[in-house]
Amino acid sequence: GASANDKWNDLQISDSSIKLKLSKNISGAELRKEISINENESVIYQKHTFTGGEGRIPVGHHLMLKIPNKAFISFSDFEFAGTPPQPIESDSSLGRSVLKYPQNVTDLNLMQRFDNKLVDTSVYPFDTSHEDLYMIISKKDMPFGWSAVSCPDQGWLWYSIKNPDVLPNTVVWLSNGGRYY
C-alpha cells in the first residue's frame, strides 16, 4: 500500500527524532509518522496519526527480525491463534509450509504440523526450510497488548506494546527459507 511504498516527506528532523508526512492521502486521510529515541534508552518509539478521510481502512505495522540461532516468541493473553484456510506454500515445487491449515489453538506450544504431530511455535526455528503464518487474536478488554521476541544467545529482546482496541490481531509470519523462488 501507499504507506509502505510511496514517498514520505520530511517535516522535522533532529538528532533524536524524525517527523514525516506521506506524499499521498489514504482514503482522503493525511498520514504522519513520528520516530524517536531517548538518550540512554534502547527503545525506538513510533507513532502514526491519520487526520481526516472517510471510510474504514485496515491498519497495522510489521517488523522483520533476523534470528541467527534460536529465539523465543511470546504474547500477552490471547483468545486463540489461528492459521489461514490454506498453507502459505501449497505447491511443493515452489515452497514448503509445515503447520496444519486451518487450525485454532490456545497454546502456542501445541500447534499441529501438517502430519498432525505437535510443535512448539513459541520457539523459533521449530523446523527447517518453511514458510508459515498464524494470527494471534487478542483478548478483549485489556488495557494494552504486547508481543516479544527474545534471543538470549545474541543478547537482545524486541517488544511491542499496542492498544488491542485499535490493533486487536497480531500476524506472525515465520519465514525460514521455505520459498524456492
List the model feature ranges, each with a label.
Residues A2-A4, A29, S42, P58-G60, ...:
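A sequence-composition feature that detects small, non-aromatic residues
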Residues R56-I57, K66, K70-Y181:
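A contiguous, surface-exposed recognition patch within enzymatic or periplasmic domains that forms
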Residues D15, G53, Q154:
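Residue-level marker of positions within ordered structural domains that often coincide
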Residues N5-N9, S16-K21, H62, L133-I136, ...:
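Intrinsically disordered, low-complexity boundary segments flanking structured domains
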